[in-house]
Design a protein with these regions (language model features):
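Catalytic-site microenvironment of enzymes
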Residues: 2-154
Length: 154
């Protein structure tokens, strides 16, 4: 619960704080955001040098909590993924380096209230295992591998 509140607080802070030090006029592209949102500009260097490893949780064979709204099923993993993409986009716009550990090459940032479930999510291109411990291990190994590559930059 604290992690969710912290993530929500960080999202609010990033969205409410004005951008500073706009320096990079170049357009950047992240296809995971979807066609409409893939292009973005770095508007600040306030997070330059910071590295974030964003994991939306669940995904693949695990939809998380399932609720019902207006006769439709709502799957937690779809909303968590959408929020992580939005957070990641804001971090990138502020000059951070961002790794999206759970990925869905088709969904992207969606502008609808009801997000359809999919099981296409991967862990950085690899299928997500059904076993919960194997899923956690896979994500830890992905993050640790990325950290080892970037470690010299810290």
């Amino acid at each position: 619960m604290r992690t969710k509140l912290w993530t929500l607080g960080l999202c609010c802070l990033l969205l409410l704080c004005p951008s500073l030090d706009a320096k990079d006029k170049k357009k950047h592209y992240e296809p995971l955001f979807g066609k409409a949102q893939a292009s973005y500009s770095v508007t600040s260097s306030s997070l330059k040098g910071a590295v974030f490893y964003l994991v939306s949780g669940h995904g693949g064979p695990d939809p998380g909590c399932i609720g019902h709204y207006q006769g439709k099923e709502l799957h937690e993993d779809e909303y968590a993924y959408d929020i992580i993409l939005r957070l990641g986009r804001e971090l990138l716009r502020r000059g951070a380096k961002v790794y999206f550990i759970i990925q869905d090459k088709k969904d992207g940032i969606r502008e609808t209230a009801i997000l359809n479930n999919s099981k296409r999510e991967t862990c950085m291109g690899k299928p997500i295992p059904l076993n919960q411990v194997a899923r956690l291990r896979q994500r830890c190994e992905a993050i640790n591998g990325l950290y080892r590559k970037d470690k010299s930059n810290y």
